Design a protein with these regions (language model features):
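N-proximal helix/coil linker or "cap" segments that precede and/or mark the start of modular domains
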Residues: 19-43
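Structural microenvironment flanking redox-active thiols in thiol-disulfide oxidoreductases
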Residues: 78-117, 128-134
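Hydrophobic beta-strand anchors of alpha/beta hydrolase catalytic cores
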Residues: 65-66, 97, 144
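A short beta-strand-turn-helix
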Residues: 43-64
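Thiol/disulfide oxidoreductase modules built on the thioredoxin-like
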Residues: 112-120, 127-173
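Active-site acidic short loop of glycosyltransferases
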Residues: 59-62, 92, 119-121, 138
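Bacterial N-terminal signal peptides
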Residues: 7-16
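Conserved redox-active cysteine motifs that mediate thiol-disulfide chemistry
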Residues: 60, 68-84
């Protein structure tokens, strides 16, 4: 019995220690994971509404939030207005939010979605071949990847949050 208990304890340590060593959460925002070891992002590209390639290097020296979403995703629909309000927050000088659709939906469906939730700030971006979703190991949507001005992924929001939450806004201002 002692051997079984010891094996179980070791399994728990192996499963949970790596997650606590490499990341932490901002108190009160359960879906935000902050990396202690930031990850350098290699050059990536995706498509805009005009089907042109867009590259992260197009946004040098910007604090980026890549928000992965789809029109059929209810949590995406709920958080999108708070993302728009964050983008429009005058406290941020270098913030750029890029909502990237991974639902393989046509432009008209996306425009209707934006209209239905009163979104008028954002451009339309696509990850039609889901390369970015794979690169960032997305497990579901919405997921937002936060990239600092030096091109390092420093946090991830897994699921939805209120991007207008004062705790989140004040924390994010440190990176602007």
């Amino acid at each position: 019995m002692k051997l079984l208990t010891l094996k179980f304890f070791i399994l728990l340590v192996v499963l949970f220690i790596p997650n606590t060593v490499n990341s932490k959460e901002l108190n009160g925002l359960k879906n935000l994971v902050i990396y202690e070891d930031q990850k350098k992002i290699s050059e990536i590209s995706f498509k805009n509404e005009k089907d042109n390639d867009v590259s992260l290097s197009d946004y040098e020296n910007k604090l980026l939030i890549l928000n992965f979403w789809a029109t059929w995703c209810e949590p995406c629909k709920e958080e999108m207005p708070s993302l728009q309000n964050l983008q429009n927050n005058s406290k941020f000088k270098n913030l750029k939010i890029l909502p990237i659709n991974i639902g393989q939906e046509d432009k008209n469906s996306i425009k209707k979605f934006f209209s239905d939730v009163n979104i008028n700030t954002f451009e339309i971006f696509y990850d039609t071949d889901v390369k970015l979703a794979k690169k960032f190991s997305l497990r579901g949507i919405p997921t937002s990847i936060l990239i600092n001005k030096d091109g390092y992924e420093f946090a991830k929001v897994i699921g939805s949050i209120n991007f207008e939450d004062p705790k989140f806004v004040n924390w994010l201002l440190n990176y602007d």
